[in-house]
């Protein structure tokens, strides 16, 4: 827990941004350079992972060079008191950065371009190379800070999001089964809940991608094992959500009639799944599963019961996912 205390007060990325700003301004002042442009570069260079910082840094540096170059050129042509110098510098910087696929550096490049115009005066060459140097200082300093200090660890966030996802998807399955038993085959409420669930699942995918990138720079066998375990857990959740979506998004005018035994089976299974979070375990419902399997076997998949057999099959697959997850 010692490495997590700061999360309750201030985020690691915020700390690293502050440190990158401090060291960048310090180096610039030691070299008698204006630090503001380097600081702008350093602030936006702090990314969720070291890999992202390096990858985007490769594009931000040439973008900054382009912005500085246009600032010098248009100031030379129109002077630093002309609105055209600012407008054309910003416009051409955006245009060229877009053409060269340097969009990640466009914002800093434009800010650098328009901010340096008032201070250029007639020292065109000096200002161009000084801005180039300060941008390089900002990129390198921020990259090193992001790589060395408080390397990003997303395990805690992953655990939280996975737990939240599981809580919501078990509850949503329970609610959907109740709707089906009541003959409510189209539901805006469960559709919205499913959309929220998919957003959480996408966030999990993003966090796993960040952590995977980070482990390529900070290799650790135990951390790889932990990430693999979380990845498998997320994969199973995705399968669950996929099958859950198939019992939520049903064709229009769907109508399914369950007999008494099937209704009891659905109630038992949905209650068991809904109780996983509270109980911390999965209570098997073998008799109920046998009932649903028997129902499917008695149906012809090409008769009027085709949708019913498909729906029961999806429920059986969801049960199988959980049965495998909680196998002893």
Swiss-Prot record:
| GO terms under cellular component | plasma membrane
What InterPro entries does the record point to?
ArAE_1
Task: List UniProt keywords, sorted A-Z.
Answer: Cell membrane, Membrane, Transmembrane, Transmembrane helix
User: Cell membrane among the record's keywords?
Assistant: yes
Classify the protein's membrane topology as the record does: Multi-pass membrane protein
Query: Among its keywords, does the record have Transmembrane?
Result: yes
Subcellular location, record wording: Cell membrane
UniProt name for this protein: UPF0421 protein SE_1574
Query: Which residues span the membrane?
Result: 26-46, 61-81, 109-129, 132-152
Q: What is its main location?
A: membrane
**Which organism was this protein described from?**
Staphylococcus epidermidis (strain ATCC 12228 / FDA PCI 1200)
């Amino acid at each position: 827990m010692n490495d997590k205390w700061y999360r309750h007060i201030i985020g690691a990325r915020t700390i690293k941004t502050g440190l990158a700003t401090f060291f960048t301004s310090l180096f610039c002042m030691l070299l008698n350079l204006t630090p503001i442009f380097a600081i702008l570069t350093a602030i936006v260079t702090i990314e969720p992972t070291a890999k992202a910082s390096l990858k985007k840094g490769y594009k931000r540096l040439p973008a900054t060079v382009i912005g500085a170059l246009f600032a010098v050129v248009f100031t030379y042509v129109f002077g630093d008191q002309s609105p055209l110098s600012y407008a054309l510098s910003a416009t051409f910087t955006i245009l060229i950065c877009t053409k060269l696929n340097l969009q990640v550096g466009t914002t800093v490049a434009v800010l650098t371009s328009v901010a340096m115009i008032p201070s250029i005066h007639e020292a065109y060459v000096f200002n161009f190379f000084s801005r180039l140097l300060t941008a390089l200082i900002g990129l390198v300093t921020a990259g090193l800070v992001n790589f060395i200090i408080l390397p990003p660890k997303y395990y805690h966030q992953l655990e939280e999001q996975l737990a939240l996802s599981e809580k919501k998807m078990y509850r949503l399955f329970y609610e959907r089964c109740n709707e089906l038993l009541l003959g409510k085959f189209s539901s805006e409420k469960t559709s919205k809940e499913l959309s929220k669930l998919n957003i959480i699942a996408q966030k999990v995918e993003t966090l796993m991608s960040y952590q995977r990138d980070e482990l390529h720079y900070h290799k650790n066998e135990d951390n790889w094992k932990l990430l693999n375990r979380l990845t498998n857990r997320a994969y199973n959740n995705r399968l669950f959500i996929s099958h859950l979506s198939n019992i939520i998004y049903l064709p229009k005018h769907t109508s399914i009639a369950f007999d008494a035994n099937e209704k009891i089976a659905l109630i038992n299974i949905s209650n068991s799944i809904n109780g996983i979070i509270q109980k911390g375990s999965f209570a098997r419902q073998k008799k109920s599963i046998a009932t649903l399997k028997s129902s499917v076997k008695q149906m012809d998949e090409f008769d009027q019961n085709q949708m019913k057999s498909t729906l029961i099959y999806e429920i059986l697959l969801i049960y199988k996912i959980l049965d495998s997850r909680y196998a002893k």
